[in-house]
Curated annotation (Swiss-Prot):
It comes from the Bacteria. SMART domains: B3_4, B5, FDX-ACB. Pfam families: B3_4, B5, FDX-ACB, tRNA_bind, tRNA_synthFbeta. This is Phenylalanine--tRNA ligase beta subunit. It is found in: Cytoplasm. It comes from Nitrosospira multiformis (strain ATCC 25196 / NCIMB 11849 / C 71).
Length: 792
């Protein structure tokens, strides 16, 4: 919110410098982002009138002007050479006199192409008021000649820009900011006197509110016989421009001015462009299928059923609370108006502007909530200004009122105030602070019942009121103390892991966490994730971030390239984040954990030989995440992974994700010199934790037996391990694979698998015969199920 300091001081004028005023606002929670002067320093510039213009005798693009400046009581015209295209007799412009100091230049009497010039007629750019200008700055015909230009143009002013939080929509108007300044500084606020404008004609336009929940308050009135041949007053144009708005025409300028002054957006329709004119009607309703509208910004919009519109009997005229339509806007030929002031429910407007890809001042205010208690007053204020500037006659106000937001009293206890703030405020002090805030209240027995004003949508609970007291009391006056609130520390369930624990494990195993956008390239989704129906964004940040991700792998690969381009050779990354799927018209979100490994297993060192990371290193990292859960892998295909080096992961019997090396096609496409190992897991499955079971530690020595079996090449190790473990032989404490061999001495269709077994009893020392009997049983199982045989 940008505004003029001088305009603010017409409402409330505290005895504070600009700097102190900005500091006071910031300390009260209304951060002043910037303070800048309206104009740079310059002097000896006055309001002047061009009396005559003649061609320069020696330059086609120059004019020799006689200029009346009235400076220091001198009525003698000055001769000034000017090259501006818009110079002509009769205009009033700023004139820099000889000796004037302008931004970046000094003015002195000189000769230009042989003609004497004793000053300079100025453009807005030359005075530092604009970055660019096409000609002289033209002033109002009634500007008093000889007046110091800085005083006439009110340039002893500063522009303040507030960085408002979303809950403070009440400060999106000068009256709201003035209310805050008055409360902060304990000053009186001067309100604009708004008197109801009496109807001069009986004509009205029928209004039908078909969406009463979305529009619980709507005011409209007819204004006839206006003239747009007049100019918007200079003071209004200045205030608009200093708030970041340009002047368009008197009616539009008035509606914008009242919005800046009160925070209430208004809209004016050309009555002649409404279907049926006075015989027609206005409808506030939701859009119908197939309807469209061309907005004032030139955008053609196909309307959706959740969009609220202002319509006549034939078509939508405006996107309610956001922007008017081009077909019904007020242009230079308008004579009759229909003026609108309304309250639209914030939830109906919120997010619409963003989804459409543009913003508007109206939407910015309505989605935060405007003061429905001032809707009628804003209408009267705009009517009065239009009549004073454009003339005309007005009809009565038609007001349709439905169920407006309730203003239920909020309980505020002094004991709670002291406990939260750490400052003891007595009843009188709290009452004084609430009076400064203009909050209505009743109090009894150290308890206040405060009714939120109609302009404060952010007040709902006791803590909101305590925050208001803290702002008025002064955050800087509250001493630092230890919290006094009671804390109940809940015990974490042992059957659930935490996300922080998952992060700790991976960081301990040399991974670094990354956080990527949830938006990715379309090709990543269709090719890398195998998602043929990605969720497209209506308003993407860029073409490279056009769809929602269903997998985290694309972001990790992008991170890999980023690090490789910066000469990193050993990279381990992980991310925990949301992924999004579309199934028909249904959308779902799933949280996933993904990891990426590239380069050597360990940093280069003298004690260990270099070895590139592989499938089994990543598998070990996943097992560390899951301990003491049971991990199973089974060969499976994934579009991003190597068809012969990828697997599906099951966690305690539930499908949990996948693991494998990056597909050679992608490795070549990305120009990667080494293999990349990737995994992606379902976080919900990871968080479920199997409780460790206590078991007796045997005091008897274990017996180790190693066996090597020949099995068909297509038999997986996992299948063999599952078969041996399924026998549930109590004395077997461990079975592990320690060697795989194919080559000389082994048939081409076979492979040799060597397993280590530890056998141990908790009650006695095992004999060799007992151990051999158990091993023989397992060998028999493998022979029967897989055609395995012992390798001699």
């Amino acid at each position: 919110m940008k505004f003029s300091e001088n305009w603010l001081r017409t409402f409330v004028n505290p005895p504070l410098s600009t700097r102190d005023l900005a500091h006071a606002l910031t300390m009260a929670g209304l951060e002043v982002e910037s303070v800048e002067p309206v104009a740079p320093a310059f002097h000896k510039v006055v309001v002047a009138e061009v009396l005559s213009v003649q061609k320069h005798p020696d330059a086609d693009h120059l004019q020799v002007c006689k200029v009346k400046t009235g400076a220091a009581g001198n009525d003698e015209p000055l001769q000034i050479v000017c090259g501006a295209a818009n110079v002509r007799a009769g205009i009033k412009v700023p004139c820099a006199l000889s000796g004037a100091q302008l931004p970046g230049m000094a003015i002195k009497q000189t000769r230009i192409r042989g003609v004497e010039s004793t000053g300079m007629l100025c453009s807005a750019k030359e005075l530092g008021l604009e970055d660019a200008s096409s000609g002289l700055l033209l002033l109002s015909p009634d500007a008093p000649v000889g007046t110091d230009f800085r005083a006439y143009y009110d340039l002893e002013d500063n522009l303040l820009t507030l960085k408002l939080t979303p809950n403070r929509g009440d400060c999106l108007g000068l009256s709201g900011i003035a209310r805050e300044v008055a409360a902060i500084t304990s000053q009186n606020r001067q309100s604009v006197e708004i008197k109801p404008v009496s109807a001069q004609i009986a004509e009205t336009l029928a209004i039908h509110v078909d969406a009463a929940t979305a529009c619980p308050l709507y005011c409209g009135r007819v204004v006839r016989g206006i003239s747009l041949d007049v100019a918007t007053p200079q003071w209004m144009v200045q205030r608009l421009e200093r708030s970041g708005l340009r002047a368009i025409n008197p009616v539009v300028d008035v509606t914008n001015y009242v919005m800046l002054e009160t925070g209430q957006p208004l809209h004016a329709f050309d009555l002649a462009r409404i279907q049926g004119g006075l015989a027609g009607s206005i409808h506030i309703r939701f859009a119908r299928p197939g309807e469209s509208i061309e907005l004032l910004n030139g955008e053609n919009l196909v309307l959706q059923p959740d969009m609220l519109v202002i319509a006549d009997d034939a078509k939508p005229l405006a996107l309610a609370g956001i922007m008017g339509g081009n077909e019904s806007g007020v242009t230079s030929g308008a004579v009759d108006l229909f003026l609108e002031s309304a309250f639209f429910s914030p939830g109906v407007i919120a997010g619409k502007s963003f989804s459409l890809g543009f913003s508007s001042d109206s939407a910015y205010r309505f989605e935060r909530g405007v003061d429905f208690g001032a809707t009628r007053a804003a209408m009267e204020r705009a009517t009065d200004l239009i009549l004073n500037i454009c003339g005309g006659r007005v009809g009565p106000v038609t007001e349709l009122r439905g169920s407006l937001p309730a203003r239920d009293p909020i309980r505020l206890g002094l004991e709670r105030v002291g406990r939260v703030l750490g400052v003891e405020l007595d009843e009188g002090r709290v009452a004084e602070l609430l009076h400064r805030l203009q909050f209505g209240f009743l109090n009894t027995d150290a308890v206040f019942y405060v009714t939120p004003p109609t302009y404060r949508f952010d007040l709902a609970i006791e803590e909101d009121l305590i925050e208001e007291l803290a702002r008025m009391y002064g955050y800087n006056r509250i001493a630092a103390t230890m919290p006094r609130a009671k804390l109940d520390i809940l015990s974490a369930p042992e059957t659930r892991r935490t996300r922080s624990r998952l992060r700790q494990i991976l960081v301990a195993r040399d991974y670094q966490e990354v956080i990527n956008y949830a938006f990715v390239e379309t090709s990543w989704e269709t090719e890398l994730a195998g998602n043929r129906t990605p969720i497209a964004l209506k308003n993407p940040l860029s073409n490279q971030l056009a769809v929602m991700r269903s997998s985290l792998l694309g972001g990790l690969i992008s991170n890999l390239q980023f690090n490789l381009n910066r000469k990193q050779s050993r990279i381990r990354l992980f991310e925990i984040g949301g992924c999004f799927q579309k199934d028909g018209q249904t959308y779902s979100q799933q949280e996933k954990l993904a990891g990426l490994c590239y380069g050597d297993v360990v940093e280069e060192q003298w004690g260990l030989p270099a070895r590139p990371v592989d499938f089994y290193d990543a598998k070990a990292d996943i097992e560390a995440l899951l301990w003491p859960g049971e991990l199973r892998v089974a060969a499976a295909r994934h579009p991003a992974l190597h068809p012969g080096k990828s697997a599906e992961i099951s966690i305690d019997g539930r499908i949990g994700g996948f693991l494998g090396e990056l597909h050679p096609r992608w490795q070549q496409k990305l120009g990667l010199a080494r293999s990349v190992v990737l995994f992606e897991l379902n976080v919900d499955v990871l968080l479920a934790r199997t409780l460790p079971q206590a078991s007796e530690i045997s005091k008897y020595p274990p017996i180790r037996r190693d066996i090597a079996v020949l099995v068909p090449k297509d038999v997986s190790v996992q299948a063999i391990l599952d078969s041996m473990r399924s026998e549930k032989l109590s004395i077997i404490s461990e079975i592990a694979l320690f060697d795989v061999y194919q080559g000389k001495g082994v048939e081409s269709d076979k492979k040799s698998l060597a397993f280590r077994m530890l056998l141990q009893d908790t009650e006695k020392t095992l004999t060799d015969a007992q151990a051999d009997q158990v091993v023989a049983k397992l060998i028999s199982v493998l022979e029967n199920r897989f055609g395995a045989r012992l390798r001699s």
